[in-house]
């Protein structure tokens, strides 16, 4: 059941990426990226790494929502272009999905590699990924957390500078 869940999430992830690549209006492009990011986090959670999936979901999608909120507000269109005009991308998507589903049912072999599960014994110690994640994030990865926060702030600042109106 777990293997099928990950397979379905990966198919939905591919649909989200093709929806973004078909160059719709910025509103729909941002929506497809947010949905794809959520599906990617769902895949990480289904591989038994709940803490990492939650951190990525909160930080990445929170930052994306702020950036896309500002850029969408600055780039609103009266009649936004939808995905209907991009028939070639959808035909390509349907073809690839048909190939994947056909491959799955023809071979019946889908491998998922998991090195360390939750509460596995590695040599002599017990590995609990979720409970040690918070302390490791602030202890060993505190500098990376501060750096990523600064990068997210600078990204928002640069986007605002690029899209603001200049009055001369």
Swiss-Prot record:
InterPro entries: ComplexI_Subunit6, NADH_UbQ/plastoQ_OxRdtase_su6, Nuo/plastoQ_OxRdtase_6_NuoJ. It is a multi-pass membrane protein. Keywords: Electron transport, Membrane, Mitochondrion, Mitochondrion inner membrane, NAD, Respiratory chain, Translocase, Transmembrane, Transmembrane helix, Transport, Ubiquinone. The keyword Coiled coil does not apply. This is NADH-ubiquinone oxidoreductase chain 6. The gene is MT-ND6. GO terms for molecular function: NADH dehydrogenase (ubiquinone) activity. The chain crosses the membrane at residues 1-21, 27-47, 50-70, 87-107, 143-163. Belongs to the complex I subunit 6 family. Signal peptide: none annotated. It is found in: Mitochondrion inner membrane. It comes from Didelphis virginiana (North American opossum). Its EC number is 7.1.1.2. Core subunit of respiratory chain NADH dehydrogenase (Complex I) which is composed of 45 different subunits. Core subunit of the mitochondrial membrane respiratory chain NADH dehydrogenase (Complex I) which catalyzes electron transfer from NADH through the respiratory chain, using ubiquinone as an electron acceptor. Essential for the catalytic activity and assembly of complex I. It catalyses: a ubiquinone + NADH + 5 H(+)(in) = a ubiquinol + NAD(+) + 4 H(+)(out). The keyword Oxidoreductase does not apply. GO terms for biological process: mitochondrial electron transport, NADH to ubiquinone; mitochondrial respiratory chain complex I assembly. GO terms for cellular component: mitochondrial inner membrane. It comes from the Eukaryota.
């Amino acid at each position: 059941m777990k293997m099928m869940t990950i397979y379905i999430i990966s198919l939905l992830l591919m649909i989200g990426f093709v929806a973004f690549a078909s160059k719709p209006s910025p509103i729909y492009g941002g929506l497809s990226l947010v949905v794809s990011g959520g599906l990617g986090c769902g895949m990480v959670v289904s591989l038994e790494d709940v803490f990492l999936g939650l951190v990525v979901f909160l930080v990445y999608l929170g930052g994306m929502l702020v950036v896309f909120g500002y850029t969408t507000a600055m780039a609103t269109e009266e009649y936004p272009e939808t995905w209907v005009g991009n028939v070639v991308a959808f035909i390509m998507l349907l073809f690839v999905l048909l190939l994947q589903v056909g491959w799955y049912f023809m071979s019946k072999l889908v491998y998922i590699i998991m090195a360390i599960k939750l509460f596995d014994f590695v040599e002599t110690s017990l590995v609990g990924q979720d409970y040690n994640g918070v302390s490791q994030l602030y202890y060993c990865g505190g500098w990376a957390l501060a750096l990523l926060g600064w990068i997210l702030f600078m990204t928002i600042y640069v986007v605002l500078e690029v899209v603001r109106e200049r009055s001369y």
